[in-house]
Amino acid sequence: MGYYLVTGVAGFIGWRVGEFLLKEGKAVLGVDNLNDAYDVTLKYWRLNELKKSENFKFYQIDITNFQALKTIFETYSISAVIHLAARAGVRASLENPWVYVDSNITGTLNLLELMKDFGVKKLVLASTSSIYAGQSPPFHEDLKVDTPLSPYAATKKGAELLSYTYHHLYGLDISVVRYFTVYGPAGRPDMSIFRFIKWIYEEKPIKIFGDGTQARDFTYIDDIARGTIASLKPLGYEIINLGGGKNPISINQIIEILERLIGKKAKREYLNFHKADVKVTWADISKAKKLLNWEPEISIEEGLKRTVNWSKENIELIKSIKV
């Protein structure tokens, strides 16, 4: 039985994709460099959840290390690669763009080269809705996205282009999935919902960039994991949006729902809107429905309820994590 190689397996999406594959009886080979882009405490928590399965193997490897990655391909039979390892975050990419180029472009190139050399034909490549900055929503996959507003978006676009080249030259079957604002239990502590929940519990001001009317197409983690795994089917080369697909919800509305679920009022601190951010994200998911028979099942109300319930069950973990 071949392994499904999941890069960035200790990350939010990597962890949940790994869990879903393991529940399906698949063997999962996970790699992650466990970098400190955000508090690693949560990465270790996710890894410990995955290690409960005998079908899970983990290696602490940086995908920019070609030789270390090559050893994985030499040692294991790999059925497909789900490439989720990346430096993420719009604002952070302005502070250290070099690490974004290394991880998101060089790391992706290393995987593509090894897939070519070892005859691994299927890649699911994680991309981002940040690529659509400056376009009019709802965003569909055919929009021209050649004007990224951040190094993060630029490097993810670069990874998409590299993957197309390897599809064209070497026949790799590649599904590029563009994620829209993923949230849920054990989510990234550098993302809004985790921070909002933590700050409400701790009665600290919630920092909001802009007036809070900016809106996001929030997508629950389980829906994202399902869509990612569905993208393993043979498609040739396709770019597919995975998002909520309905009217986006504002940051102010998210805070109001969290206040109700937690039972505490938030303190709000409004800051200047960041010029690398976008005002609205909104996915056209008609392509995902057609090609993957996929659409989100979890509403924003239900998803936030599950997220808050998880936070209550893991309150000491939440409090220990630095944001």
From Swiss-Prot:
This is UDP-glucuronate 4-epimerase. Keywords: Isomerase, NAD. GO terms for molecular function: UDP-glucuronate 4-epimerase activity. InterPro entries: NAD(P)-bd_dom, NAD(P)-bd_dom_sf. The keyword Isomerase applies. Its EC number is 5.1.3.6. Belongs to the NAD(P)-dependent epimerase/dehydratase family. It is an enzyme of class 5 (isomerase). SUPFAM superfamilies: NAD(P)-binding Rossmann-fold domains. The lineage of its organism: Bacteria, Pseudomonadati, Thermodesulfobacteriota, Thermodesulfobacteria, Thermodesulfobacteriales. NAD(+) binds at G11, F12, I13, K156. It catalyses: UDP-alpha-D-glucuronate = UDP-alpha-D-galacturonate. Its cofactor is NAD(+). Signal peptide: none annotated. Catalyzes the interconversion of UDP-D-glucuronic acid (UDP-GlcA) and UDP-D-galacturonic acid (UDP-GalA). Gene3D superfamilies: NAD(P)-binding Rossmann-like Domain (3.40.50.720). The active site is at Y152 (proton acceptor). It comes from Thermodesulfobacterium geofontis (strain OPF15).
